[in-house]
Amino acid sequence: MNAGSPKPRAPACDRNRDPILAVLRGHFAGRRRVLEVGSGTGQHAVYFAGAMPWLEWQASDVAQNLPGIRAWLDDAGLANTPAPLALDVLQPWPEVDADAVFTANTLHIMGWNGVEAFFRGAGRVLSAAPGGMLAAYGPFNYGGGYTSDSNRDFDAWLRARDPQSGIRDFEAVDALASQAGLRLVDDVAMPANNRCLVWRVVSSASG
């Protein structure tokens, strides 16, 4: 991003940030550091870090998106937002000491191999974090069906654009989370036919 160029902006982030925050504020209350995977423009990182100052909010994304994220972080000047990390879910992840992972509107964009890699990576990050949490926001299908006509249309648009992308089945995603050592603790209906899914690390004591 060139000096003086406007920060990237996604209108959807302005619309969904408060409903997401209402979920995260409760589930991340006892957490200390969040790794956000796929921070996109950086809007969520700034908003959530400002609203939850007890958390260190570690933004990350593929390298080409980092300048825009830095622009948001630098403009906000928050003490709890370190420099964003380059993270491609299909490549080795950087070492991050985090006890929560968050992602928004990414699982339907990446291919299924990316979704699998995301849950493996998140599971590794959280494996040493007792009570670690993973939250994912976006559209999901249930029982093999769409939750709305608009989601059906959106899925068709996604697959026409990239056959590897598409709205994911909740059951398949939850199975990946389980394989990564996580158990679903919340599934919250959100505006515009989205969901916020929250998993917790399964402690060894609970088997």
Positions of predicted regions on the chain:
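Core SAM-dependent methyltransferase catalytic element
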Residues: 182-207
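Conserved beta-strand signature within the Rossmann-like core of class I S-adenosyl-L-methionine
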Residues: 129-141
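Conserved class I S-adenosyl-L-methionine
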Residues: 30-40
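Class I SAM-dependent methyltransferase SAM/SAH-binding core
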Residues: 35, 43-91
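A short acidic, Gly/Pro-enriched loop at the edge of an enzyme's catalytic core
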Residues: 93-101
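A short, conserved alpha-helix within the catalytic core of class I
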Residues: 110-122
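Short alpha-helix
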Residues: 164-180
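Class I SAM-dependent methyltransferase Rossmann-like catalytic core
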Residues: 1-29
